[in-house]
Amino acid sequence: MKLSADLKAFEGRIGHQFREPERLLRAVTHSSLSSVTRSDNQRLEFLGDRVLGLVMAEALLAADRAASEGQLAPRFNALVRKETCAAVAREVALGDVLKLGRSEMMSGGRRKEALLGDALEAVIAAVYLDAGFEAARQLVLRLWGARIAQVERDARDAKTALQEWAQARGLPPPTYEAVDRSGPDHAPIFTVEVRLGNGETDRAAAGTKRVAEQAAARALLARMEARHD
């Protein structure tokens, strides 16, 4: 088959020309558009998640040969989580070439973090099946680029770090509450409040509750650590 102009341009952006173009088409096809004659990208996403994990594990081990498993695990999680995958997907304009059903398209599917992250994992799997592990490894290293070297030495997610801070001071785990929702249905903004057992609170807003919780925890932890330094 012959790829459309937009998919050919996408090949250029990711630096891989598919020997079997059908693999790329499947990788960018969401389940909202799948049919008997058109497969979606869910199985590719499953495989791509594992390929990405192996590439990142190898890269982190090579980057810091003295790090323990306990130090490497949070760095790994920071590099493979959906928010990171979605950010990488945006950098190569993956959303522009996604094949979506009408309802998913109307609800802003091209901008959804989960959908973008899943599709990027599917693309990684498509490259793996098309040209082997080394091609997939080079793709991941190329797309993630400096993120691997710059991942924080202590890359625990903010909610975990805040909970550990609280427990070390005899406080119960922080609580999180969604206190507001604004914006249109296809691009909502959630405001989340985090509260510590000592009465300290902070708020943050983001496009998903998960990201808002992380941002609120990060802000409160920074304030608490600055106050107790």
Swiss-Prot record:
Q: Any keyword Cytoplasm?
A: yes
Q: What is its main location?
A: cytoplasm
Q: Which GO terms describe its cellular component?
A: cytoplasm
Query: Which residues fall in a coiled-coil region?
Result: none
Can you say what this protein is called?
Answer: Ribonuclease 3
**A Pfam cross-reference name:** dsrm
The record ties this protein, via PROSITE patterns, to: DS_RBD, RNASE_3_1, RNASE_3_2
- What gene does this protein come from? rnc
Q: Which UniProt keywords apply?
A: Cytoplasm, Endonuclease, Hydrolase, Magnesium, Metal-binding, mRNA processing, Nuclease, RNA-binding, rRNA processing, rRNA-binding, tRNA processing
Against NCBIfam families, the record matches this protein to:
RNaseIII (TIGR02191)
The entry's Mg(2+)-binding residues are E45, D118, E121
Q: What does this protein do?
A: Digests double-stranded RNA. Involved in the processing of primary rRNA transcript to yield the immediate precursors to the large and small rRNAs (23S and 16S). Processes some mRNAs, and tRNAs when they are encoded in the rRNA operon. Processes pre-crRNA and tracrRNA of type II CRISPR loci if present in the organism.
Give the family, as the similarity comment puts it.
Answer: Belongs to the ribonuclease III family.
PANTHER family (alphabetical): RIBONUCLEASE 3, RIBONUCLEASE III
Q: How does it assemble?
A: Homodimer.
Source organism per UniProt: Cereibacter sphaeroides (strain ATCC 17023 / DSM 158 / JCM 6121 / CCUG 31486 / LMG 2827 / NBRC 12203 / NCIMB 8253 / ATH 2.4.1.) (Rhodobacter sphaeroides)
* An annotated Gene Ontology molecular function: metal ion binding
Question: Which Gene Ontology BP terms does the record give?
Answer: mRNA processing; regulation of gene expression; rRNA processing; tRNA processing
- What does the record give as the reaction this protein catalyses? Endonucleolytic cleavage to 5'-phosphomonoester
Write down the required cofactor(s). Answer: Mg(2+)
